[in-house]
Amino acid sequence: MRLVHGKDAVNALDVSWLSPILVRDPTSPSESAWDLFATFMRTRTMKSTATNMNQHPTTAQICRRFATRLFRGTVSIRPLTLTLGCLAASASASLVAQETATNAAASQADAISKCPVMGNPAGPNRHTVSGAMGNGDWWPNQLNLDMLHQNSVKSNPMGEDFDYAAAFNSLDLAAVKADIKELMNTSQDWWPSDYGHYGPLFIRMAWHSAGTYRVSDGRGGASDGTQRFAPLNSWPDNANLDKARRLLWPIKQKYGSKISWADLMVLTGNCALEDMGFETFGFAGGREDVWEPQKDVYWGPETEWLGDKRYSGDRDLQNPLAAVQMGLIYVNPEGPNGKPDPIAAAKDIRETFGRMAMNDEETVALIAGGHTFGKAHGAASPDGNMGVEPEGEGLAAQGLGWINTHGTGNAGDTITSGLEGAWTSTPAEWSHGYFENLFGYEWKLVKSPAGAWQWTPTDENAKGTVPDAHDASKSHAPMMFTTDLALRMDPEYGKISRRFHDNPEQFEKAFAKAWYKLTHRDMGPVSRLLGDSVPEPQLWQDPIPEATFDVIGSKEIEQLKQKILATNLTSSQLVSTAWASASTFRNSDMRGGANGARIRLAPQKDWEVNEPAELASVLTTLEGVQKEFNASRKDGKQVSMADLIVLGGCAGVEAAAMKAGHAIQVPFTPGRTDATQEMTDVESFEPLKPIADGFRNYQGHNADRPAEEMLVDKANLLSLTAPEMTVLVGGMRALDTNAGAGPLADLGKLTKRPGALTNDFFVNLLDMNTVWKQSPMCEHFFEGRDRESGNLKWTASRVDLVFGSNSQLRGIAEVYASEDAKEKFVKDFVNAWTKVMNLDRFDVNDSESTETQVAAK
């Protein structure tokens, strides 16, 4: 999706290309060179660069002299600082190009255009802006592997060794909260607070940070602070939240690296609720910031704001999307596509909130609780009054957007959603006024000053019951959105709303728990949560019990591996079962994984991809090993099924490596425990069900994308790099782990030695004596025939062939197909395997894993 920092913002600065540049600078810049650059920058402080060039003719000479030293290598400079300085100069050079076009000083204009620092090619035809033509423009169906390499340490200013958990734990959280609450009660002239309190604005900020989460793929949410970056920082639904974050900057600046933006936004939302009289359920830190826009999140097919091409048929919403329109967090408050129909709006609300992991009661509680505070802003039409979003603004705006020219541009003249007014008579205090007004009045349809549909009481006595946000001499009637009326008019929502109206304590408890779920849903298990305000584990956090026994040691590990290998289970069965257990993990919301051994439980035990009958047989055999071992121990040591399943996979890999001529020890860290069915929300786990698993050459029946794209998507959720994904696929094919029987079992099995951990998959895939053609059996299957005889040699899937077709993946495959790569292949496979097995081991440091050792037999 290139809508914000692509098509609609072709001049948006693209700094992603800086990541490969090393930031280590062993020398210092010469003072004279820096004097030149400083002089150049000082001369650019006047009204425009063009005027500056007229008044200071030596500027171009200074620029050229500095650039000459740079390119001759006599200036040594930290690349990031230099590049940003040059890019800032280049960006403002657009003014130079425009203003010097008619300037009589043609020689000076020519000097500017040729200057290596300020030269400005016409149009977005340069690699430093996102609108430049790239590979994706030439070949739009090219496999996008960038998502596998996002969030590199090279883009992270904190460095590889920064320990955020330790930094957060050193924080005086009470002092932070006190500072936040003081800030909320101190209005700033540049963006005055409504009702003298920034709390409602901060609740919206926290809500919209968390509200992008969708349960289908676990992406979105508050856990990485991406509201700071495109596209979220420029979504229409996030209008003026740039001001909320700027208001918070003094707090962030004071505490620095001890609290991330991601944590600060959620904590501030909690503080806002508390300072306005509501008792929250809890708060946990531990959200670590990312430092770049995320490339793995699909936000929709639209190319314009508020488009709804995501729907088909009878309003069928495309997966994995949850919001109804491009640029909205949830639903359109005016109703579907702006049509004020509360019943139709209820349908959208139910689907959208459901896709964000909320049931009907949680949905009503969240909407009603959130709308107890603050107001909507629609003082005038945005047309002609509202500037562009932050990503489309110029340099002088310094990252702010939606600049408002109506009246004062803020306070009573604020334009945000276009709807106008407050829901209750105490917008800066917790109350039960929302339901009192919702059921206490009859409502009629009106338009806001901005022209948006909203509802006002038919009772004239309602006028004057709501104070003005800024002028004590004014008052208003309450208002409701179409989506608010849906909570009264929809039969199911109506029942819940009336119950909450009649039982305020139930409403308060439901809102507190729903708010906690909303803001913590994507943080994973309780073991990842930091701070002393973390409540007891909730069912939606997929709880795992604490160990009530001593874990096994190295001696017992070796004994158990021998016992497992002595059963009738093959390496393929052991590896497949361990992979099925561990590969449910999603790095997006930290759910799934091998800990808990939920592969034994519904729904995972019944998923088609896990081949239920085969799985049941393997688990029964492993349970026998577990029972025998545990019964024999007198020292308190026990082995869980979660550990035994993973250990079985490790033993299978070792045996397969030995079969290929390599002795290797696969690292294994015990300590997993077994969850129960009562600890497992079946409905909540269904979205973890793989639609496709390219590592097992499995393709489900409801795929919405080519199999190779779904492989990359799964690899991203497993936090794998392209080389790790490649070596795992090659190894899994050699180990004969395909899901399915008959022809499916042989797809991609490009080896005459199945079950041996060889690099045969890559060797045979890249063999030029084989010609590949689509199979008559299925468009997703291919046949590899001998180039001369035409005899069938292999069958393969789209996933298999992409490693020879995609130039980047082929380059990696060539490494593993080389004669000198046999040992490297085994070692790299084991390292990637161990990574996947431990993805959910948040209780284990990376340093606790042993180094993989491999030797020829």
Curated annotation (Swiss-Prot):
GO biological process, alphabetically ordered: cellular response to hydrogen peroxide; hydrogen peroxide catabolic process
Q: Which Gene3D superfamilies match?
A: 1.10.520.10, Peroxidase, domain 2 (1.10.420.10)
Q: Where does heme b bind?
A: 371
**Where does the record place the catalytic residues?**
208 (proton acceptor)
Q: Where is this site: Transition state stabilizer?
A: 204
What reaction does this catalyse?
H2O2 + AH2 = A + 2 H2O; 2 H2O2 = O2 + 2 H2O
User: Its domain of life?
Assistant: Bacteria
| Listed cofactors | heme b
Keywords on record: Heme, Hydrogen peroxide, Iron, Metal-binding, Oxidoreductase, Peroxidase
Against Pfam families, the record matches this protein to: peroxidase
Q: Where is this cross-link: Tryptophyl-tyrosyl-methioninium (Tyr-Met) (with W-207)?
A: 330-356
- Chain's role: Bifunctional enzyme with both catalase and broad-spectrum peroxidase activity.
Concerning its family, UniProt says:
Belongs to the peroxidase family. Peroxidase/catalase subfamily.
UniProt subunit comment: Homodimer or homotetramer.
Instruction: Please state what the protein is called.
Output: Catalase-peroxidase
**Species in which this protein is naturally found:** Rhodopirellula baltica (strain DSM 10527 / NCIMB 13988 / SH1)
Report which gene this protein is encoded by. katG
